[in-house]
Amino acid sequence: YVGMYGEQDADLTYRLWQTLKQKINEEEVGEIYKLESSLIRVLIEMRRRGVRVDLDRAEQVGKELKNKEDKLLSQIKNWYGITPDLWAAASVAQVFDRAGLEYPRSPKLNAPSFTSAWLESHDHKLPLAIAQARKFNKARTTFIDKMILDHEVDGRVHGELHPLRSDEGGTVTGRFSCSNPNLQQVPARDPEIGSLIRSLFIPEEDCHWGCFDYSQQEPRLTVHYSLLTKQEGAQEAAEAYTDDADFHQIVADMANISRKEAKNINLGLSYGMGKDKLIRQLGISEEEGQILFDQYHERVPFIRGLRDTCARLGSNRGFIKTILGRKCRFNLYEPMSYRDTPYPYEKAVETYGKGVKRAFTYKAMNRLIQGSAADMTKKAMLDLHNEGILAHTQVHDELNISVKDKQECEKVIEVMRDCVKINVPNKVDAEIGKSWGEIENYKEYFK
C-alpha cells in the first residue's frame, strides 16, 4: 500500500516549501525564483515539441560526407601506401613518417600529437588532407549520425535544456546547457560544414526558420553596469553606443588601438584573464604589451573600474547580483598572499590559518555580465511564450523560432529587445530562411 508513502511525499514537500519560501524572501531572490519557476513549463513544451529535421536530406548529406572522407583517405593511400585511422595519433604518425614530415609531440608522454589547429596551418598536402578528412568524419558521425539519426523520433529531435546545470558553471551564472543531444554544439563557424549541418533543421509547417540573435549582448551590459557604477569614461562609451555600434570598435577608437587588440583585451579582462596571458594571446613582447595595456587603461578606464568594483563587491559581500536578482556567490576561500586550492571557510582556515580571502572574485565581473545576459535571454523566452511564441533552440545569445510572417518576426524582435531595460540601446538581429542553415537578413527575405 503506497497511499501513506504518497501522502508523506506531499506533506514533506509542502513543509520544505514553507522553510524555503522564507529563505527566498530573506535572500531577496524572489524575482529570479519566479523567473526560473515560470520557465519550467516553457522548457517542457520546447522539449515535447522538439525540432523538425529533414531526415532524407540528413541521410543524403551523410553519404556525401562519407564519400568525401573516403576520397581523401584513398588519396593518402595513393601517395604513401597507408590508410590512416584518422583519430589515432600513432596511425597518423606512421603516414607522416612515410612522408618524411616532422610533427609535434605531447610534452609529458612524448607521444605524437595532431591538433586541428596545427594540421590546418601546415602548408603540406598531407596534414591538410588529414584535417579535411577529420572534418568530414566528425560532421557525419557526431552531428548527423549521433545528433540527428540516433535521436530523432518521428522526424523531430527532442533535446534537453538545463537552466541551472552545466559542466562550465551553469549554476554560477544561470546560463543554459543542453544534452541528449546538445543542440548548442551544432557547428556555426565553419562555412562549409556549419551551414550544411544547420540546413537539416527545418521550421514548422507553413513557417520560416527565424534566428534571433542579441547583438553584442555582453558588451552592452558591460557599458550598462559601467554607467550604473559611475565609472570614468563610461558616459563617452554610452554616447557612442547607437543601435548599430560595435563595442570593440568604440573601445579601439577610444584607446587608439586596433579593433583586434581591443577585442582581445575586452574579452580577456571580462573573463578575468591576467596581463601575461593576454600578451601571449596577442603575440607581442612584454614591453609592447605593457605600453598597450597602459594606453588601454588610461583611455578606457571604465573596464578596469567595473572589474575592480565587481571584485570588491564579491569579496566584501560574498556575492554579485545580476540584473534580475540572481546571486552569483563566492563561497570558497584561499590563502591571502598566494594561490592554492580553495575550500569552504572552515576547511580553508583549518588548512591555511586565519589569513584567508574569498577565491575567484577576479571573475566577479564575468559572472555579473554572463549572469545578466542569461537573465535577459530567459526573460525573453518567457515573454515570448506569453505571446504564444515558443523557441526551438537556445544557443547562448541566440533564439531559433518558427515564424509565420514578417509581422511575427518583428514581434519577436520587439519582445526580445524590450524584455529587460538597460541604459544603452539594445538590439536584436534577425535572419530568416527555409532552414537554420539557409538564412538571410529578414528585411531582404521578406521583400
Placement of each model-derived feature along the sequence:
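Helix N-cap motif at beta-to-alpha junctions
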Residues: 286, 404-408
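Conserved catalytic core of nucleic-acid polymerases
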Residues: 48, 101-104, 124, 253-390, ...
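Metal-dependent catalytic core segments for phosphate chemistry
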Residues: 218-254, 332-355
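Catalytic phosphate/metal-binding cores of nucleic-acid and nucleotide-processing enzymes, i.e., regions
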Residues: 22, 35-42, 358, 378, ...
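A common structural junction motif
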Residues: 299-300, 414-424
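Short hydrophobic/aromatic beta-strand micro-patches
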Residues: 281, 400-404
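Conserved "right-hand" nucleotidyltransferase catalytic core of DNA-directed polymerases
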Residues: 1-193, 202, 206-208, 215-218, ...
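Conserved short beta-strand edge segments in small beta-sheet-based binding/regulatory domains
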Residues: 421-433
